Amino acid sequence: VEIEGELLGIGALMEFDGYGEVKRIFVHPKSRGNGVATAILNRLEREARSLGLVAMKLETGTKQPDAIALFEREGFVICDAFGDYPVGDPYSVFMQKKL
């Protein structure tokens, strides 16, 4: 997200077999709490849908309650570890949203 040439936040979606993984969402500290992360996540979801993906998945840290709350507000639910992530990682939260 960029406004008047100022970068407020970034995000990335990596395509896998049938799903997209949200790889990063970062919002500049001075822009947090203004809907920037939601806008980025919504843009990534539109991209996933345009690619014909059936789900979006992500991994975030257990000590990131604001991120977890954002993802839950946007329809993500807790899921099992996926891809190359280790099962039982005590520091990770895995989430997915069916599209």
Regions found by a protein language model. Give the residues of each.
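Residue-level signal for short amphipathic helical patches enriched in basic/charged
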Residues: 17, 51, 59
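Short coil/turn segments at alpha/beta junctions that flank glycine-rich nucleotide-binding fingerprints
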Residues: 34, 50-54
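Active-site acidic-Proline motif in GNAT/NAT acetyltransferases
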Residues: 28-30, 34, 62
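C-terminal "cap" of GNAT-fold acetyltransferases
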Residues: 54-57, 61-99
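Structured loop/turn residues at beta-strand edges in well-structured enzyme cores
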Residues: 6, 51, 77
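Acetyl-CoA-dependent GNAT
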Residues: 1-23, 28-30, 41-43, 47, ...
